From Swiss-Prot:
Residues 118-181 are annotated as: Disordered. GO terms for cellular component: nucleus. Residues 118-133 have a biased composition (Polar residues). This is Pre-rRNA-processing protein TSR2 homolog. Keywords: rRNA processing. Residues 134-146 have a biased composition (Acidic residues). GO terms for biological process: maturation of SSU-rRNA from tricistronic rRNA transcript (SSU-rRNA, 5.8S rRNA, LSU-rRNA). InterPro entries: Pre-rRNA_process_TSR2. It comes from Danio rerio (Zebrafish). The gene is tsr2. Belongs to the TSR2 family. May be involved in 20S pre-rRNA processing.
Amino acid sequence: MAPLSSSTREVFSEAVRAVLETWPVLQIAVDNGFGGAFSQQKAEWMVDALQQYFTDNGDLQPDEVEDFISELMNNEFDTVVDDGSLPQVAQQVCGMFQQCEQGRLAEVREQILKLNQKKTSSGRAKATPAQTPQDDDDDDEEEAMDCEGGSAGASVSSTAVNDLHHEEEEDDGWTVVRRKK
């Protein structure tokens, strides 16, 4: 495999950037600071690291690229990708690299344009917090207080809430919280 020319390398770098910037997992990791204060810089560094990985290694297979990206996400963003998107991202980057190697830069630029349009039209992915069972209990208690109404009802509800949690200390120093029925 011959090394990529500088113009081809630039196109491939743009392609990698476009793929990673439209990948919801990385967007969420950056937006929520999974990589710390420098999450955005780490995402930009990933583009260079991935491009360098292709430059340094010949004839990469999608599963090797997938492993590399997975390792980067785990090390830099403390994120394990298990949504099924990682093989797609790896396949997309590998395909664009092959097109660059074959000199089909116009096709790669067209794909970059489509990805950039997708990025601007769809916006950024958002992480929504999952409601835990404990949150459900809190909502039920609030609803009970709302349904009771009046000051007497509120005092009954708050007493019931306090009675829900009974603490007892065991011999080993742990405090066990149990619900009364």
